[in-house]
Curated annotation (Swiss-Prot):
Protein's gene: rpsO
Function statement: One of the primary rRNA binding proteins, it binds directly to 16S rRNA where it helps nucleate assembly of the platform of the 30S subunit by binding and bridging several RNA helices of the 16S rRNA. Forms an intersubunit bridge (bridge B4) with the 23S rRNA of the 50S subunit in the ribosome.
InterPro entries assigned to the protein according to its UniProt record, in alphabetical order: Ribosomal_uS15, Ribosomal_uS15_bac-type, uS15_NS1_RNA-bd_sf
Keywords, sorted A to Z: Ribonucleoprotein, Ribosomal protein, RNA-binding, rRNA-binding
Protein name per UniProt: Small ribosomal subunit protein uS15
Family of the protein in this entry: Belongs to the universal ribosomal protein uS15 family.
PANTHER family in alphabetical order: RIBOSOMAL PROTEIN S15, BACTERIAL AND ORGANELLAR, SMALL RIBOSOMAL SUBUNIT PROTEIN US15M
GO CC entries: cytosolic small ribosomal subunit
NCBIfam families tied to this protein: S15_bact
Length: 87
């Protein structure tokens, strides 16, 4: 992920001016990395090292989504809708 791509994702999902670490931003960045790695694994089927990293990222995103779901359900629903994720 390039710097400009990362900045555009942060600008899209930030909740205030200097926001880089809110759950929404973290989930969006993880989703982008997951999608990129998923494309990589379609062509490199035996890359088990990257597959393990993908599974760790999916688990981390799931934990952040569960946190939002438990504490701020409206923000959770908004993030799910904007990223097109399943519940």
């Amino acid at each position: 992920m390039e710097r400009t791509e990362k900045k555009s994702i942060i600008d899209t999902f930030k909740t205030h001016e200097n926001d880089t670490g809110s759950p929404e931003v973290q989930i969006a960045l993880l989703t982008d990395r997951i999608n990129h790695l998923n494309d990589h694994l379609k062509t490199h089927k035996k890359d088990h090292h990257s597959r393990r990293g993908l599974l760790k990222m999916v688990g981390q995103r799931r934990n952040l989504l569960n946190y939002l779901k438990d504490n701020q359900i409206e923000r959770y629903r908004e993030v799910i809708a904007r990223l097109g994720l399943r519940k």
